[in-house]
Each structure stands twice: as structure tokens, then as C-alpha cells.
Curated annotation (Swiss-Prot):
Organism in which the protein naturally occurs: Wolbachia sp. subsp. Brugia malayi (strain TRS)
Membership in a protein family: Belongs to the universal ribosomal protein uS19 family.
Stated role: Protein S19 forms a complex with S13 that binds strongly to the 16S ribosomal RNA.
Entries under SUPFAM superfamilies matching the protein: Ribosomal protein S19
KW Transit peptide (keyword) present: no
InterPro entries: Ribosomal_uS19 (IPR002222), Ribosomal_uS19_bac-type (IPR005732), Ribosomal_uS19_SF (IPR023575)
Annotated keywords: Ribonucleoprotein, Ribosomal protein, RNA-binding, rRNA-binding
PANTHER family: RIBOSOMAL PROTEIN S19P FAMILY MEMBER, SMALL RIBOSOMAL SUBUNIT PROTEIN US19M
Protein name: Small ribosomal subunit protein uS19
Disulfide bond entries: none
GO BP term, example: ribosomal small subunit assembly
GO cellular component, one term: cytoplasm
Gene: rpsS
Length: 94
């Protein structure tokens, strides 16, 4: 079920504070480390660089596309590593 239309988009207060501080200081190239994967990317985040925590490492996310606005930070920071499918053992044996 989607979020109610009357509610504003969720963005953690600490993320908003860090974004506003970066915009006020003019430090656009500085990476902002965040843990809140559920926060929505807002229009004022455009042009900033983030490091989103996936449970082990910080994954760099650069918000430089208009299409990223409205998505969540967690969508761009995968938490699982794909190990690949096992090949056919008969084909390897030949």
C-alpha cells in the first residue's frame, strides 16, 4: 500500500539538517554520510553526494538526475551481494 496523499514525504530530520548545512556552507562536493535508507530524496538534495550505509559499508550515491527525486536512498544502496548462479556441472566436465 502506498503512502497517503495528505502526508508529506518522509525524510529523517538528521538528513534534512545535514543537507541544509551543506547547502548553506556551499560544500556541494563534500560527501554526506547517512544511515537513513527510508528517507526520500527531496529536490533540495539535487547536486549533492551521499554515502548511504547498507549495513556493512557506505555506498556512494550522487543525486545528479531529476528522476532520482521521490525515490528512497535505500534503492541505490544494495544490501545483498549477488554471488551468481552455479553453472551446469556437465558442461564443465567435458
Amino acid at each position: 500500500m502506498s503512502r497517503s496523499a495528505w502526508k508529506p514525504p518522509f525524510c529523517h530530520p538528521s538528513v534534512l539538517r545535514l543537507v541544509n548545512r551543506a547547502l548553506k556552507q556551499g560544500s556541494i562536493n563534500k560527501v554526506i554520510k547517512i544511515h537513513s535508507r527510508a528517507s526520500v530524496i527531496l529536490p533540495n538534495c539535487l547536486g549533492l553526494k551521499f554515502a548511504v550505509y547498507n549495513g556493512k559499508d557506505y555506498i556512494p550515491v550522487s543525486v545528479n538526475d531529476q528522476n532520482m527525486i521521490g525515490h528512497k536512498f535505500g534503492e541505490f544502496s544494495p544490501t545483498r551481494k549477488f554471488a551468481g548462479h552455479n553453472g551446469d556441472k556437465k558442461a564443465v566436465r567435458r
